[in-house]
């Protein structure tokens, strides 16, 4: 027995979808780095800390990038570092590459920021996002014509990004007309910029672990040194790993913690992807 439910309105399955409203591009070609000439390349998502990282070596120097989204500070943070001082040379820019949106980009050289603001074309949902660069050592110059920052001989670079919309889960308009997106974003960027990278990182870890550490699952196998893609291949070929099953369970918990904190439900199906 089955039932077919028809909801009022046309195109009932089209409930909208999540939209990206800002791409950050990092170009390391100034250092001579390509996909083919780096060594010891490794990517990792640490479920225990909620931090994604990329590491590699080039000309006997080790480079590392760490990424996380901090719920307490409401910012996305990327930190770039090297094993030797003055070895970071790259360019950074932010672009709007989404045909469903319209917006404009402003370049604030004095504050070392880049901001995109605009709206969704079909429903006028407003958005704003700002990227700010913070350097330890080295220098930063601005190519205003191409709207790109160029970093030279830096020891460490921290990129802070904040984003917000005027969405409000309140029928029937689903808009917060009182929200000043500029004030919200500027406050987040300014407050986060006053903290060191280690402070931002520690705040994020403590917040993440306050939720993640509530549940543990032990199926009797631990293979943390085996790459995940290898575990998946072995599982598909009949070498069943209980550790992979544990990992999948905890990964689902991580996605919920990272993506849905009560402000908006997680995407649970193909619709809206």
Show where each model-derived region lies:
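Aromatic-residue-lined binding/catalytic grooves and analogous aromatic/hydrophobic interfacial grooves
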Residues: 1-273
